[in-house]
Amino acid sequence: MVASNSVAVGCAVGIPVGVGLIIAGCFWLRLQRRFKREDEQDADLQRAVFDEDAYINFESMPTLRNNNNNDEDNNDDKRIKKIEENGNENTIPINDNKEQRKSKYFVPAYRRKINALSVRYDGQQNIEMQGFGANSSKVSLDSSNAPPKRVISVYDQMVPFVDGDKNSVIQNTELLESNDSVGNDSTRPSSQANLISNLNSNDFGSYYPRKESFSSINIPHLNTSSPSFTTRPSSVNSMIRPNSTDNIFDTPRKSNSDIVSINKDQVNRTGSPVKGTVISENMGYKLKNNYNIENSNEIAEEDQYENEFTNYSQNKKEFIDSLRPK
């Protein structure tokens, strides 16, 4: 009786656990197989990108092809046959309907783009081989007269070319359009020379022209220089001073008493006060600071910014006095 109970409990617990482990193992193996396949695809693509001197040969990368997608292969064959009938290499439709793009697995966007490039490359090779077999003599003569076809590197496929014309507007094109224009243009100069010429023709150090304001549109621009700062208007004593040009940043070398004495001498000489002059103690420019103007020769350096409005010591004293309780 005890043995039958233990067997029943073991079967009830062990069988579901065993089935779950088997199912989990199957999913794990499938996931590992998928990871391995994706690692191989990424390694092939990275190897092709880092090869600078070789064209991306999709025949050497079978992992990039989706063998499980039979509908896509049939669509590619139809596309190539249509190209052969039309005889135009640039009429390859890239975008397909959703019904024609059904796949068993999810394909990323960059791999769909690579597959489209591989289809275009295969179609071009088939057309070239058929043209060579149909009229080989004409092809040989044309190839001898034509310039040598340049070798397309990986950078030519990945990096789009910039138009060398300065006046033309640079338009952003997709990777497929740039690859198509680069791969089909055999008479174009080498990529290195074209890149150098484009870099030399572009002006990277200039700025866009400044937009004129509405107030200055109808006003003629005069070629006159404007002063960097506006000085004070000449004071009453400008005609008495030896230098009429006032320098507001210069330390005055004359005291107020000297200016008053000059005004008195002017009055005594003429017998009447000069027109526009007033004898007062407010005449002239007086620098009120902590230094004495009369001993200016003994002062090594004066604080030009400490005057009657910015008397730091006086303001500090008044501020401290205002904090005291009254």
Curated annotation (Swiss-Prot):
Extracellular face residues: 1-8
Keywords for this protein: Cell membrane, Cell wall biogenesis/degradation, Membrane, Signal-anchor, Transmembrane, Transmembrane helix
Name the UniProt record assigns to this protein: Suppressor of lethality of KEX2 GAS1 double null mutant protein 1
Summary of the function given for this chain in its UniProt record: Plays a role in cell wall integrity. Affects the cell wall polymer composition in the growing region of the cell.
Localisation per UniProt entry: Cell membrane; Bud membrane
The species this protein was found in: Vanderwaltozyma polyspora (strain ATCC 22028 / DSM 70294 / BCRC 21397 / CBS 2163 / NBRC 10782 / NRRL Y-8283 / UCD 57-17)
Segments on the Cytoplasmic side according to the record's topology features: 30-326
Cystine bridges: none
Bilayer topology: Single-pass type III membrane protein
Domain of life according to the entry: Eukaryota
Membrane-spanning segments: 9-29
Family indicated by similarity: Belongs to the SKG1 family.
GO cellular component: cellular bud membrane; cellular bud tip; incipient cellular bud site
Annotated region described as Disordered, given as residue ranges: 177-199
Transmembrane helix in keyword set: yes
Any one of the GO BP annotations: fungal-type cell wall organization
Keyword Metal-binding listed: no
